[in-house]
Amino acid sequence: KLLGDIIEQKGAGEGFGVAFIDSKEIWYLETGSGHQWLAVRLPADSYFVSANQGRLRHYDPNDNANYMASPTLVSFAKKQGLYDPARGEFDFHQAYSQDNKNDTTYNYPRVWTLQHQFNPHLDTVVSEGETFPVFLTPITKISVAAVKNALRNHYQGTSHDPYASHNPQEPWRPISVFRTQESHILQVRPKLPQAIGNVEYIAYGMPSLSVYLPYYQGMRHYQPGDDKGTDRASNDSTYWTFRTLQTLVMQDYNAFAPDVQHAWKTFEQQTAKQQYKMEQSYLRLYASHPKEAQRLLQNFEDKTMQNAQTLARRLTNNIITTMTYRTDMKYHFSSTQP
């Protein structure tokens, strides 16, 4: 409601979407640009996928438990010729968003791919984005690991993978792109103390070549390099530690990516096991020994972040070693040359 009030008062120059999550529910807000907006509460058993396009459709002004909107959302659309009641019920997407040729390659494939990942038997066609369901119930519960995989998707295993095929002109825009600055996953577990129940997983840079690191709400300090990072590479920046590695991998994706991805997969699996052990120990301590529980959590954070950066530097050095050897072989000028 606060963001909606700002949109109504100040306006928005373009469409955007924002998710809100707490211990009870998730809401998703989209703007219609200008001073119009719509927010919908996600059904408890459903998930929502969005690319760079408005996706919300249905609006029930009488259902305050599941919908919030700008007061003139429907009347403005009618006045401006964006909605004709004679043609059926109000559709937010049809009134305030669009489906054009660019969407068929830039947006539709991403939504279609993830919906089919969580609902493999879905019969939608990738080129018909206007038919995609807004909300879907997955065939199995979606885990944090599944969300990581989703955000790393680049159509691997298909002809649309731009990295494996060395094709920067691939029409389908992948989910994982090099220009990603950070990728975030928010997890709220209401049955746990907030200190460990609320976790933000952050991957610095390109998700498919990065590692998702767990930042617990209860941590008290970060690593020294976490607050450093500009558009200039630097050795003391956490961001650039991972970004440098990704830049090197992209010089020969097929040669370097498999080892890096395997290393991060192993690291995340090991970290997940360590998280579980830490959380169990925290639960045994936090009521009677809160300071000890806090130290336990902080020590886990410090060790995890330090180990991730150490691994990133080792992987970087491995690639530099290989590239140095290649360069030497290419420009060796051996004395035995004819």
Where are these regions (language model features)?
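C-terminus-biased signal that marks the final domain/tail of proteins
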Residues: G11, G15, S23-E25, V49-P338
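Catalytic cofactor-binding cores of redox enzymes
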Residues: L2-H58
